[in-house]
């Protein structure tokens, strides 16, 4: 082979290797990206019919948390539609009424059966020892 052909072959092999590496990186990133649907998107979209696991995000409706012996149910809303969620397991400490949550699971017979519940938190979190009291006590 001529030197020119060897160089061309090396450049082509380098491009193929770089393309394969890029394809691998993008496929791994796609699996780790964590987006979610709103309750309206889930209930009106094609995801409603599929039995594939999806993530749904919204706010926990106040007064909707009901605990039974083996599960917890609550309603999740995007302020347009509500979705009833059933979960068996430990809830995160930040979970509560009026708090943002993301649930992962499947929609079965109008109820969302969650495998995982994540509570969103305020980005302005500050530990208790650093917080300033809202009102100082009256001196006696």
Swiss-Prot record:
A Gene Ontology term for the protein's cellular component: plasma membrane
Q: Which GO BP terms sit in this record?
A: cytochrome complex assembly
Q: Which residues lie on this side of the membrane: Periplasmic?
A: 29-140
Q: List the keywords (alphabetical).
A: Cell inner membrane, Cell membrane, Cytochrome c-type biogenesis, Heme, Iron, Membrane, Metal-binding, Signal-anchor, Transmembrane, Transmembrane helix
Query: Known SUPFAM superfamilies for this protein?
Result: Heme chaperone CcmE (SSF82093)
Q: Which Gene3D superfamilies match?
A: Nucleic acid-binding proteins
Superkingdom of origin organism: Bacteria
Main subcellular localization, coarse class?
membrane
Q: Where in the cell is it found?
A: Cell inner membrane
Q: How does it sit in the membrane?
A: Single-pass type II membrane protein
Q: Which residues bind heme?
A: 121, 125
- Provide the GO MF annotations for this entry: heme binding; metal ion binding
For the Cytoplasmic compartment, the record's topological domain ranges are 1-7
Q: What is the role of this chain?
A: Heme chaperone required for the biogenesis of c-type cytochromes. Transiently binds heme delivered by CcmC and transfers the heme to apo-cytochromes in a process facilitated by CcmF and CcmH.
Q: Which family does it belong to?
A: Belongs to the CcmE/CycJ family.
Name used for this protein in its record: Cytochrome c-type biogenesis protein CcmE
Which species is this record about?
A: Anaplasma marginale (strain Florida)
Upper lineage is: Bacteria, Pseudomonadati, Pseudomonadota, Alphaproteobacteria, Rickettsiales
- Gene that encodes the chain: ccmE
